[in-house]
Amino acid sequence: MGLILRWKEKKQLSSKQNAQKSRKPANTSFRQQRLKAWQPILSPQSVLPLLILMACVFAPIGIGLVVSTISVQRLVVNYTECDALAPAKHFETIPSEYVDYHFSKKVAVQPQWMVLTDPELGNQTCRIQFEVPNHIKKSTYVYYRLTNFNQNYREYVQSLDLDQLKGKALIGNDLDPNCDPLRTVENKTIFPCGLIANSMFNDTFGTTLTGVNDTADYLLTTKGIAWDTDSHRYGKTEYNASDIVPPPNWAKLFPNGYTDDNIPDLQNWEQFKIWMRTAALPNFYKLAMKNETNGLGKGIYIADIELNYPVRSFYGTKSFVLTTNSIIGAGNEALGIVYLIVAGIATLFAILFLIKVIFKPRPMHDHSYLNFENSDTPFDESSVVSIPLREIL
Protein backbone atom coordinates (compact mmCIF):
# COMPACT_ATOMS: atom_id res chain seq x y z
CA MET A 1 0.00 0.00 0.00
CA GLY A 2 2.83 2.38 0.83
CA LEU A 3 4.47 1.69 -2.50
CA ILE A 4 1.27 2.61 -4.32
CA LEU A 5 0.95 5.92 -2.42
CA ARG A 6 4.58 6.85 -3.11
CA TRP A 7 4.08 6.03 -6.79
CA LYS A 8 1.01 8.31 -6.92
CA GLU A 9 2.92 11.13 -5.19
CA LYS A 10 5.79 10.86 -7.68
CA LYS A 11 3.32 10.89 -10.56
CA GLN A 12 1.59 14.02 -9.23
CA LEU A 13 4.95 15.73 -8.64
CA SER A 14 6.16 14.94 -12.17
CA SER A 15 2.88 16.22 -13.64
CA LYS A 16 3.28 19.50 -11.70
CA GLN A 17 6.86 19.88 -12.93
CA ASN A 18 5.74 19.27 -16.51
CA ALA A 19 3.01 21.86 -16.09
CA GLN A 20 5.55 24.37 -14.77
CA LYS A 21 7.91 23.70 -17.67
CA SER A 22 5.18 24.10 -20.28
CA ARG A 23 5.90 26.74 -22.94
CA LYS A 24 2.26 27.07 -23.89
CA PRO A 25 1.14 30.74 -23.79
CA ALA A 26 -1.53 31.68 -21.29
CA ASN A 27 -5.12 31.35 -22.43
CA THR A 28 -5.81 35.07 -22.80
CA SER A 29 -7.06 37.13 -25.73
CA PHE A 30 -3.74 38.93 -26.02
CA ARG A 31 -1.47 35.86 -25.75
CA GLN A 32 -3.69 33.76 -28.01
CA GLN A 33 -4.14 36.60 -30.56
CA ARG A 34 -7.90 36.82 -30.18
CA LEU A 35 -8.09 40.58 -29.70
CA LYS A 36 -10.78 42.32 -31.68
CA ALA A 37 -9.44 44.25 -34.67
CA TRP A 38 -10.86 46.47 -37.35
CA GLN A 39 -9.91 45.48 -40.87
CA PRO A 40 -11.30 48.09 -43.26
CA ILE A 41 -12.46 46.94 -46.68
CA LEU A 42 -11.07 49.52 -49.09
CA SER A 43 -13.21 50.31 -52.09
CA PRO A 44 -13.39 53.29 -54.48
CA GLN A 45 -16.42 54.58 -52.58
CA SER A 46 -14.57 54.58 -49.26
CA VAL A 47 -11.22 55.84 -50.59
CA LEU A 48 -12.65 58.73 -52.64
CA PRO A 49 -13.51 60.95 -49.63
CA LEU A 50 -10.06 60.38 -48.14
CA LEU A 51 -8.31 61.38 -51.38
CA ILE A 52 -10.50 64.46 -51.78
CA LEU A 53 -9.84 65.47 -48.16
CA MET A 54 -6.09 64.98 -48.63
CA ALA A 55 -6.10 67.14 -51.76
CA CYS A 56 -8.13 69.86 -50.02
CA VAL A 57 -5.66 69.95 -47.12
CA PHE A 58 -2.35 69.69 -48.98
CA ALA A 59 -3.14 72.03 -51.90
CA PRO A 60 -3.74 75.23 -49.83
CA ILE A 61 -0.70 74.50 -47.66
CA GLY A 62 1.48 73.99 -50.74
CA ILE A 63 0.20 77.16 -52.40
CA GLY A 64 0.82 79.13 -49.20
CA LEU A 65 4.37 77.80 -48.90
CA VAL A 66 5.18 78.58 -52.54
CA VAL A 67 3.75 82.11 -52.29
CA SER A 68 5.67 82.80 -49.07
CA THR A 69 8.87 81.50 -50.68
CA ILE A 70 8.40 83.72 -53.73
CA SER A 71 8.04 86.74 -51.42
CA VAL A 72 11.50 86.06 -49.94
CA GLN A 73 14.13 88.42 -51.40
CA ARG A 74 17.68 87.16 -51.40
CA LEU A 75 21.20 87.45 -52.75
CA VAL A 76 23.53 84.43 -52.77
CA VAL A 77 27.18 84.85 -53.76
CA ASN A 78 29.48 81.85 -53.90
CA TYR A 79 32.82 83.47 -53.03
CA THR A 80 34.90 80.28 -52.91
CA GLU A 81 36.97 81.37 -55.92
CA CYS A 82 37.10 85.06 -55.01
CA ASP A 83 40.82 84.92 -54.18
CA ALA A 84 41.56 83.24 -57.53
CA LEU A 85 39.18 84.99 -59.95
CA ALA A 86 38.54 88.47 -58.55
CA PRO A 87 40.87 91.31 -59.60
CA ALA A 88 42.91 93.20 -57.03
CA LYS A 89 42.56 96.81 -58.17
CA HIS A 90 39.00 97.21 -59.42
CA PHE A 91 35.56 95.63 -59.31
CA GLU A 92 34.62 93.01 -61.87
CA THR A 93 31.26 91.38 -62.56
CA ILE A 94 30.93 88.06 -60.78
CA PRO A 95 30.42 85.13 -63.19
CA SER A 96 26.77 84.11 -63.32
CA GLU A 97 27.43 80.58 -62.01
CA TYR A 98 28.54 82.09 -58.68
CA VAL A 99 25.53 84.39 -58.19
CA ASP A 100 21.83 83.87 -57.54
CA TYR A 101 19.39 86.60 -56.52
CA HIS A 102 15.69 87.37 -56.35
CA PHE A 103 14.24 90.81 -55.62
CA SER A 104 10.87 92.44 -56.15
CA LYS A 105 12.32 94.66 -58.88
CA LYS A 106 14.86 94.09 -61.61
CA VAL A 107 18.53 94.57 -60.77
CA ALA A 108 20.25 97.17 -62.96
CA VAL A 109 23.83 96.55 -61.77
CA GLN A 110 25.09 92.98 -61.54
CA PRO A 111 27.00 91.95 -58.38
CA GLN A 112 30.75 92.57 -58.58
CA TRP A 113 33.78 91.56 -56.56
CA MET A 114 37.44 92.29 -55.96
CA VAL A 115 40.06 90.88 -53.59
CA LEU A 116 42.16 92.95 -51.19
CA THR A 117 45.45 91.72 -49.69
CA ASP A 118 47.04 93.01 -46.50
CA PRO A 119 50.74 93.53 -47.39
CA GLU A 120 51.90 93.03 -43.78
CA LEU A 121 49.80 90.13 -42.56
CA GLY A 122 48.98 88.60 -45.93
CA ASN A 123 45.28 88.35 -45.09
CA GLN A 124 42.88 88.47 -48.02
CA THR A 125 39.46 90.12 -48.04
CA CYS A 126 36.78 89.47 -50.63
CA ARG A 127 34.86 92.70 -51.28
CA ILE A 128 31.42 92.20 -52.83
CA GLN A 129 29.43 95.09 -54.32
CA PHE A 130 25.75 94.51 -55.02
CA GLU A 131 22.55 96.42 -55.70
CA VAL A 132 19.30 96.25 -53.76
CA PRO A 133 16.76 97.51 -56.36
CA ASN A 134 13.91 98.12 -53.93
CA HIS A 135 13.39 99.00 -50.29
CA ILE A 136 13.11 95.89 -48.11
CA LYS A 137 10.80 96.54 -45.18
CA LYS A 138 11.28 93.15 -43.57
CA SER A 139 14.06 92.05 -41.26
CA THR A 140 17.29 91.19 -43.03
CA TYR A 141 19.52 88.23 -42.25
CA VAL A 142 23.02 87.24 -43.34
CA TYR A 143 23.92 83.56 -43.48
CA TYR A 144 26.97 81.64 -44.58
CA ARG A 145 26.36 78.51 -46.63
CA LEU A 146 28.71 75.53 -46.78
CA THR A 147 28.46 72.57 -49.13
CA ASN A 148 29.94 69.09 -48.96
CA PHE A 149 30.70 69.47 -45.24
CA ASN A 150 29.41 66.43 -43.35
CA GLN A 151 28.72 67.46 -39.77
CA ASN A 152 26.54 64.40 -39.25
CA TYR A 153 29.31 61.80 -38.84
CA ARG A 154 28.95 60.09 -35.48
CA GLU A 155 32.60 60.54 -34.53
CA TYR A 156 32.33 64.25 -35.35
CA VAL A 157 28.99 64.87 -33.60
CA GLN A 158 30.21 63.28 -30.35
CA SER A 159 33.58 65.06 -30.37
CA LEU A 160 33.01 67.52 -27.50
CA ASP A 161 32.86 67.65 -23.72
CA LEU A 162 29.59 69.05 -22.37
CA ASP A 163 30.99 69.71 -18.90
CA GLN A 164 33.93 71.64 -20.33
CA LEU A 165 31.54 73.78 -22.39
CA LYS A 166 29.57 74.54 -19.23
CA GLY A 167 32.73 75.98 -17.64
CA LYS A 168 34.27 73.14 -15.64
CA ALA A 169 38.08 73.10 -15.64
CA LEU A 170 38.65 69.48 -16.68
CA ILE A 171 42.16 68.26 -17.47
CA GLY A 172 43.75 65.18 -19.01
CA ASN A 173 41.79 61.98 -18.63
CA ASP A 174 38.88 63.82 -17.00
CA LEU A 175 37.89 65.07 -20.44
CA ASP A 176 35.48 63.08 -22.56
CA PRO A 177 37.51 60.53 -24.60
CA ASN A 178 35.37 61.43 -27.62
CA CYS A 179 37.46 64.61 -27.85
CA ASP A 180 40.45 62.56 -29.04
CA PRO A 181 42.75 63.34 -30.76
CA LEU A 182 42.13 66.95 -29.70
CA ARG A 183 42.13 66.69 -25.89
CA THR A 184 45.63 67.77 -24.90
CA VAL A 185 48.77 69.20 -26.48
CA GLU A 186 52.09 69.06 -24.59
CA ASN A 187 50.33 68.39 -21.26
CA LYS A 188 48.01 71.36 -21.77
CA THR A 189 44.28 71.05 -22.22
CA ILE A 190 42.72 72.13 -25.50
CA PHE A 191 39.86 74.52 -24.82
CA PRO A 192 37.37 73.82 -26.23
CA CYS A 193 38.32 70.25 -27.10
CA GLY A 194 37.05 68.13 -29.97
CA LEU A 195 36.63 68.16 -33.73
CA ILE A 196 33.54 70.38 -33.86
CA ALA A 197 35.19 73.34 -32.15
CA ASN A 198 38.42 72.88 -34.10
CA SER A 199 36.60 73.08 -37.45
CA MET A 200 34.61 76.22 -36.60
CA PHE A 201 33.86 78.51 -39.55
CA ASN A 202 36.21 81.49 -39.24
CA ASP A 203 35.62 83.69 -42.29
CA THR A 204 34.90 87.14 -40.87
CA PHE A 205 31.87 89.06 -42.16
CA GLY A 206 31.91 92.82 -41.69
CA THR A 207 29.01 93.96 -39.53
CA THR A 208 28.38 96.99 -41.77
CA LEU A 209 27.07 96.98 -45.32
CA THR A 210 28.78 100.11 -46.60
CA GLY A 211 26.56 102.27 -48.78
CA VAL A 212 27.91 103.57 -52.11
CA ASN A 213 27.27 107.17 -53.25
CA ASP A 214 24.18 108.44 -51.42
CA THR A 215 23.19 105.09 -49.92
CA ALA A 216 23.29 105.01 -46.12
CA ASP A 217 25.29 102.34 -44.32
CA TYR A 218 23.32 99.38 -43.01
CA LEU A 219 24.32 97.96 -39.62
CA LEU A 220 24.05 94.30 -38.67
CA THR A 221 24.57 92.56 -35.34
CA THR A 222 25.71 89.18 -34.09
CA LYS A 223 23.67 89.51 -30.89
CA GLY A 224 20.64 87.27 -30.55
CA ILE A 225 21.51 84.94 -33.43
CA ALA A 226 21.86 81.78 -31.31
CA TRP A 227 18.97 79.68 -30.09
CA ASP A 228 17.76 80.51 -26.58
CA THR A 229 17.56 76.79 -25.84
CA ASP A 230 21.35 76.53 -26.21
CA SER A 231 22.15 79.02 -23.46
CA HIS A 232 22.17 76.38 -20.69
CA ARG A 233 24.85 74.36 -22.50
CA TYR A 234 27.58 77.00 -22.10
CA GLY A 235 29.14 78.81 -19.18
CA LYS A 236 32.10 80.99 -18.25
CA THR A 237 35.19 78.83 -17.97
CA GLU A 238 37.12 78.23 -14.75
CA TYR A 239 40.43 77.52 -16.53
CA ASN A 240 43.59 79.54 -15.99
CA ALA A 241 45.14 80.80 -19.21
CA SER A 242 48.41 78.99 -18.43
CA ASP A 243 46.67 75.60 -18.36
CA ILE A 244 44.97 75.67 -21.75
CA VAL A 245 45.70 76.17 -25.43
CA PRO A 246 43.36 76.96 -28.34
CA PRO A 247 42.46 74.26 -30.89
CA PRO A 248 45.01 73.93 -33.73
CA ASN A 249 42.80 75.62 -36.32
CA TRP A 250 42.32 78.64 -34.06
CA ALA A 251 45.99 79.61 -34.34
CA LYS A 252 45.16 82.55 -36.60
CA LEU A 253 42.56 83.84 -34.16
CA PHE A 254 44.89 83.41 -31.15
CA PRO A 255 48.43 83.61 -32.62
CA ASN A 256 50.06 83.91 -29.18
CA GLY A 257 47.78 81.49 -27.39
CA TYR A 258 45.47 82.36 -24.52
CA THR A 259 46.00 85.12 -21.99
CA ASP A 260 43.86 86.18 -19.06
CA ASP A 261 42.31 88.82 -21.31
CA ASN A 262 41.42 86.81 -24.40
CA ILE A 263 40.03 83.48 -23.15
CA PRO A 264 36.80 83.06 -25.14
CA ASP A 265 33.59 83.44 -23.16
CA LEU A 266 31.52 80.61 -24.60
CA GLN A 267 28.48 81.75 -22.66
CA ASN A 268 28.23 84.93 -24.76
CA TRP A 269 29.97 83.81 -27.97
CA GLU A 270 26.94 83.30 -30.18
CA GLN A 271 28.82 82.47 -33.39
CA PHE A 272 30.38 79.54 -31.53
CA LYS A 273 26.98 78.35 -30.31
CA ILE A 274 25.65 78.47 -33.87
CA TRP A 275 28.52 76.33 -35.14
CA MET A 276 28.28 73.77 -32.34
CA ARG A 277 24.67 72.98 -33.33
CA THR A 278 25.62 70.48 -36.02
CA ALA A 279 23.73 70.23 -39.31
CA ALA A 280 22.00 67.06 -40.48
CA LEU A 281 22.87 67.44 -44.17
CA PRO A 282 26.16 68.17 -45.97
CA ASN A 283 24.81 71.42 -47.49
CA PHE A 284 23.59 73.85 -44.84
CA TYR A 285 23.07 77.48 -43.83
CA LYS A 286 24.09 79.04 -40.52
CA LEU A 287 23.06 82.47 -39.32
CA ALA A 288 25.91 84.98 -39.09
CA MET A 289 24.26 88.40 -38.58
CA LYS A 290 20.87 90.07 -38.63
CA ASN A 291 18.96 93.35 -38.42
CA GLU A 292 15.40 93.01 -37.16
CA THR A 293 14.80 96.68 -36.41
CA ASN A 294 15.42 98.53 -39.69
CA GLY A 295 14.60 97.70 -43.29
CA LEU A 296 17.28 97.57 -45.97
CA GLY A 297 17.03 100.64 -48.19
CA LYS A 298 17.31 100.76 -51.95
CA GLY A 299 20.85 101.34 -53.20
CA ILE A 300 24.29 99.84 -53.77
CA TYR A 301 26.19 98.25 -50.89
CA ILE A 302 29.62 96.74 -50.23
CA ALA A 303 30.19 93.70 -48.01
CA ASP A 304 33.68 92.70 -46.84
CA ILE A 305 34.55 89.08 -46.03
CA GLU A 306 37.95 88.16 -44.60
CA LEU A 307 39.01 84.85 -46.16
CA ASN A 308 40.21 82.25 -43.65
CA TYR A 309 38.17 79.07 -44.06
CA PRO A 310 39.73 76.44 -46.40
CA VAL A 311 36.79 74.74 -48.12
CA ARG A 312 38.86 73.43 -51.04
CA SER A 313 40.38 70.77 -48.77
CA PHE A 314 37.04 68.92 -48.68
CA TYR A 315 35.88 69.98 -52.18
CA GLY A 316 33.21 72.25 -50.76
CA THR A 317 32.00 75.80 -51.36
CA LYS A 318 31.19 78.77 -49.16
CA SER A 319 28.62 81.45 -49.91
CA PHE A 320 27.46 84.83 -48.62
CA VAL A 321 23.67 84.87 -48.27
CA LEU A 322 21.66 88.07 -47.73
CA THR A 323 17.97 87.29 -47.35
CA THR A 324 14.62 88.04 -45.79
CA ASN A 325 12.57 85.31 -44.15
CA SER A 326 9.10 83.84 -44.55
CA ILE A 327 6.78 82.17 -42.06
CA ILE A 328 8.89 79.00 -42.32
CA GLY A 329 12.25 80.75 -42.24
CA ALA A 330 14.44 81.23 -45.29
CA GLY A 331 13.06 80.40 -48.73
CA ASN A 332 12.33 76.70 -49.20
CA GLU A 333 10.79 76.05 -52.60
CA ALA A 334 11.06 72.27 -52.32
CA LEU A 335 8.69 71.99 -49.35
CA GLY A 336 5.83 73.80 -51.08
CA ILE A 337 6.38 71.82 -54.28
CA VAL A 338 6.23 68.52 -52.36
CA TYR A 339 2.88 69.50 -50.83
CA LEU A 340 1.51 70.40 -54.27
CA ILE A 341 2.75 67.10 -55.74
CA VAL A 342 0.98 65.13 -53.00
CA ALA A 343 -2.21 67.14 -53.59
CA GLY A 344 -1.94 66.54 -57.34
CA ILE A 345 -1.46 62.78 -56.92
CA ALA A 346 -4.44 62.58 -54.54
CA THR A 347 -6.60 64.54 -57.01
CA LEU A 348 -5.53 62.34 -59.93
CA PHE A 349 -6.40 59.11 -58.14
CA ALA A 350 -9.67 60.59 -56.90
CA ILE A 351 -10.66 61.38 -60.51
CA LEU A 352 -9.64 57.91 -61.70
CA PHE A 353 -11.61 56.19 -58.95
CA LEU A 354 -14.63 58.40 -59.65
CA ILE A 355 -14.54 57.51 -63.35
CA LYS A 356 -14.21 53.84 -62.42
CA VAL A 357 -17.23 53.98 -60.11
CA ILE A 358 -19.41 55.86 -62.63
CA PHE A 359 -18.63 54.04 -65.85
CA LYS A 360 -17.61 50.58 -64.69
CA PRO A 361 -19.02 49.83 -61.25
CA ARG A 362 -18.56 46.47 -59.59
CA PRO A 363 -21.85 45.77 -57.76
CA MET A 364 -20.56 42.50 -56.32
CA HIS A 365 -18.20 44.54 -54.18
CA ASP A 366 -21.14 46.24 -52.50
CA HIS A 367 -21.07 45.24 -48.83
CA SER A 368 -24.79 44.43 -48.91
CA TYR A 369 -23.99 41.46 -51.13
CA LEU A 370 -21.78 39.96 -48.46
CA ASN A 371 -24.72 39.08 -46.16
CA PHE A 372 -25.82 35.52 -46.93
CA GLU A 373 -27.74 34.87 -43.73
CA ASN A 374 -31.17 35.72 -45.20
CA SER A 375 -30.47 34.40 -48.67
CA ASP A 376 -33.02 31.88 -50.05
CA THR A 377 -30.80 30.93 -52.99
CA PRO A 378 -29.14 27.53 -52.57
CA PHE A 379 -25.37 27.51 -52.55
CA ASP A 380 -23.91 26.39 -55.88
CA GLU A 381 -20.36 25.15 -55.35
CA SER A 382 -19.66 24.78 -59.06
CA SER A 383 -20.33 28.47 -59.67
CA VAL A 384 -17.79 29.45 -57.05
CA VAL A 385 -15.13 27.18 -58.45
CA SER A 386 -15.58 28.56 -61.94
CA ILE A 387 -14.85 32.14 -60.84
CA PRO A 388 -11.21 33.09 -61.63
CA LEU A 389 -9.03 33.97 -58.66
CA ARG A 390 -8.39 37.49 -59.91
CA GLU A 391 -12.16 38.17 -59.91
CA ILE A 392 -12.47 36.98 -56.33
CA LEU A 393 -9.62 39.25 -55.23
Swiss-Prot record:
What are the glycosylated positions? 78, 123, 187, 202, 213, 240, 291
Ranges in the topological domain labelled Lumenal: 68-334
The primary location reported for this protein is Golgi
Residue ranges, annotated region (Confers specificity for binding DNF3): 70-332
Report the transmembrane regions from the record: 47-67, 335-355
| Disulfide bridge map | 82-126, 179-193
* A Pfam family this chain is assigned to: CDC50
Subcellular compartments: Golgi apparatus, trans-Golgi network membrane
Per the record, its GO cellular-component terms are: endoplasmic reticulum; Golgi apparatus; phospholipid-translocating ATPase complex; plasma membrane; trans-Golgi network
Q: Which family does it belong to?
A: Belongs to the CDC50/LEM3 family.
Q: Per its database record, what is this protein's job? A: Accessory component of a P4-ATPase flippase complex which catalyzes the hydrolysis of ATP coupled to the transport of phosphatidylcholine and small amounts of phosphatidylethanolamine from the lumen to the cytosolic leaflet of the trans-Golgi network and ensures the maintenance of asymmetric distribution of phospholipids. May be involved in transport from early endosomes to the trans-Golgi network (TGN).
Q: What else is known?
A: Present with 4510 molecules/cell in log phase SD medium.
PANTHER family recorded: CDC50, ISOFORM A, CELL CYCLE CONTROL PROTEIN 50
The protein's name: Phospholipid-transporting ATPase accessory subunit CRF1
Query: Which species is the source of this protein?
Result: Saccharomyces cerevisiae (strain ATCC 204508 / S288c) (Baker's yeast)
